[in-house]
Amino acid sequence: ALFLGRVFQDPMTGTAATMSIEENMAIAARRGQKRGLGWGVTKKEREHYREALKELDLGLEDRLSSKVGLLSGGQRQAITLLMASLKKPKLLLLDEHTAALDPKTAAKVLALSDKIISENNLTAMMVTHNMKDAIAHGNRLIMMHEGRVIYDVSGEEKKNLKVSDLLAKFEEVSGGEFANDR
């Protein structure tokens, strides 16, 4: 788990609802380390968490002692994303991490994802059924059907893609029609 950071579809699964924001972040920050009988969160750590939360621009930096269960789904997902990237994993897995969010919040979490990935030079794999998001984010797009890769595109070809191109490619390769829910 030290080399993998992950954010799942359900905003409720990435955090401990009855714990505070800083307690959740402390657990994530200590992933892979021995835990002794010291203070739960030091002043230095608290300041580090405050600065990291400030970067999210959600007003959470002044709510470190707030229970995570009282936050919105988008706020929880943003914290989960931050927690997953605290230890700079070799791979950040984003498994439909915006599917349970409203469009405005999903867009904000995607922008935060892009920012965190870029600033920390992380390798990320985002699983999504949203074709627009698949095209707009990342530098490579892999389309799968029934457990196998049916399309793999990157570079200029990916930049020039449209949703209609992906749907046509799916129909061509799979022999079926794609039910687009977006």
Task: Go through each PLM region and give its residues.
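Helix N-cap at the start of a conserved alpha-helix in ABC-type nucleotide-binding domains
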Residues: 103-105
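Walker B catalytic motif
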Residues: 96-97
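H-loop/switch region of ABC-family ATPase nucleotide-binding domains
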Residues: 128-129
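Conserved beta-strand-loop-alpha-helix hinge in the C-terminal portion
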Residues: 148-172
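Q-loop/switch helix immediately C-terminal to the Walker
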Residues: 19-31
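ABC ATPase C-loop
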Residues: 84-85
